[in-house]
Swiss-Prot record:
Keywords: Cytoplasm, Methyltransferase, rRNA processing, S-adenosyl-L-methionine, Transferase
Pfam families: Methyltransf_5 (PF01795)
Subcellular location: Cytoplasm
GO MF annotation list: rRNA (cytosine-N4-)-methyltransferase activity
The UniProt record lists the keyword Nucleotidyltransferase: no
Disulfide cross-links: none
UniProt record similarity statement: Belongs to the methyltransferase superfamily. RsmH family.
Lineage: superkingdom: Bacteria
Name of the protein: Ribosomal RNA small subunit methyltransferase H
Length: 313
């Protein structure tokens, strides 16, 4: 299926780019190109001396990026956790003026049944961001134990019925001639295993999220990107990060908070504020930003988005 038919509305477009405080001649990284909404807006704010490097794991995102004919722009087919390697290869370590990350799954990925991310559309159970490498969700489910699956569902989906669902999935795969291979097939098995239904949320929501996060090592990728951001950024370089679920947002929030706190010193000790702040690597910029009611109405998928911004000292 050609995913160009799937409309993608970039979430918190202006807020995330404004958070970078773009310098016209600066060097920026869009770590999650997607369909290019943030990248195109960044390019519109750069002078001829400015530069934008984008990364993405999705081959279809790379194809979209290759349609941008602009000498200031380049795309690299890799995960955003590899940004330090990209910068090192380009001689840009410590010279980046801003990094933007828009975490999670894009609308084209969700809406294309062939990608296997959605429990609302029937398609092959894939879920890989990069379809050129790694195990698909179906391949992993065919070999996972009930205990390991329950751990994934609990850890990455905060699923209260993790053990029941895991047992149902593994039992089905052991007894059936044909193992689970379709999205709606898995969604139905999960729905049948859940004893209490939330009328506001599909019973497979948390399980699909958890399996997707595990298959793509999403939290590991984010952890690596956060830990390396300080070495990549130039002084006063900005981090602008949009997350879509509590696990991601908690990681981003804790990272920014931890790296923006000074030393704990005894009360009354004569020490200058400049000395206290000398070894604080980050400054948090403003409060967390959520989509407006108007944006949520225009794009309901933006509802859970949270934007956090920080600046390297």
């Amino acid at each position: 299926m050609n995913d160009t038919v799937h409309k993608h509305i970039t979430v918190l477009l202006h807020e995330a780019v404004d958070g970078l405080a773009i310098k016209p001649s600066g060097i920026y990284i869009d770590g999650t190109f997607g369909r290019g909404g943030h990248s195109r807006l960044i390019l519109s704010k750069l002078s001829e001396q400015g530069r934008l490097i984008a990364t993405d794991r999705d081959p279809r995102a790379i194809a979209e990026a290759n349609t941008i004919d602009d000498t200031r722009f380049q795309i690299v087919h890799t995960a955003f956790s590899a940004i330090p390697d990209v910068c090192e290869q380009l001689g840009l370590t410590g010279k980046i003026d801003g990094i933007l990350l828009d975490l999670g799954v894009s609308s084209p990925q969700l809406d294309d049944a062939e990608r296997g991310f959605s429990f609302m559309r029937d398609g092959p159970l894939d879920m890989r961001m990069d379809t050129t490498k790694g195990l698909s969700a179906a391949e992993w489910l065919a070999q996972v134990s009930a205990d390991d699956l329950a751990w994934v569902l609990k850890t990455f989906g905060e699923e209260r019925f993790a053990k029941r669902i895991a047992q149902a999935v593994v039992s089905y795969n052991k007894s059936a001639t044909d193992k689970i291979s379709r999205t709606l097939q898995l969604a139905q098995i999960i729905a049948d295993a859940v004893p209490f239904k939330d009328k506001h949320k599909h019973p497979a929501t948390r399980s699909f999220q958890a399996i997707r996060i595990f298959i793509n090592s999403e939290l590991d990728e984010l952890e690596k990107a956060l830990q390396s951001a300080l070495s990549v950024l130039a002084p006063e370089g900005r981090l602008s990060i949009i997350s879509f679920h509590s696990l991601e947002d908690r990681m981003v929030k804790q990272f920014m908070k931890k790296n923006s706190k000074g030393m704990d010193v005894p009360k009354g000790l004569p020490i200058l504020e400049s000395e206290l702040n000398k070894n604080i690597p980050l400054k948090i910029i403003g409060k967390a930003i959520m989509p407006s009611e108007a944006e949520i109405e225009a794009n309901p998928r933006s509802r859970s988005a949270v934007l956090r911004i920080a600046e390297k000292r």
